[in-house]
Amino acid sequence: MSEYVVDTSVVIKWVVGEPETALALALRQHRLSAPDLLVAECANILWKKVRRNELTGDQAVFAARLLDRADIELVPARGLMEAATSLAVALDHPAYDCLYLSLSERSGRPLVTADTRLLKKLGTTPAGIYSGRVIDLRAM
């Protein structure tokens, strides 16, 4: 069993049919962790899907219940904030995503993401410093 950090772009696919849902579900056989920010981000995505008429309120609440029971080690964001802020400034990228990067660096576990904006940003870093540490879900 491998160990990974996963972000919201991966976890939300467990409960909402999206491209790469099967790949995201396959990750559940591994040991997974994420900053506790994941909970708020998933809830917000579910709310947005209700607002866009992509889910009913009942479906969103049911999806939230399933995610709340998911086997993911939630790590307090508080201990990641300084490193995440430093990464956000260095990368000129939102600190929310950098919390996941920070946890990946601290734990030594690769980050798996489907966030194309983050992947594009990291692809422009000097000498591919994130190569192998950040994995595109589509490459799993």
Question: Can you name each region flagged by the protein language model?
Answer:
Residues 37, 43-83:
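Active-site-proximal, substrate-binding regions of enzyme catalytic domains
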Residues 72-120:
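Active-site neighborhoods of divalent-metal-dependent phosphate/nucleic-acid chemistry enzymes
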Residues 3, 35, 101, 105-140:
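Acidic, PIN/NYN-like endoribonuclease modules and their adjacent C-terminal/linker elements
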Residues 10, 16, 39, 44-47, ...:
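Hydrophobic side chains within alpha-helical segments
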Residues 1-37, 52-61:
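Short, well-structured N-terminal submotif of metal-dependent ribonuclease cores
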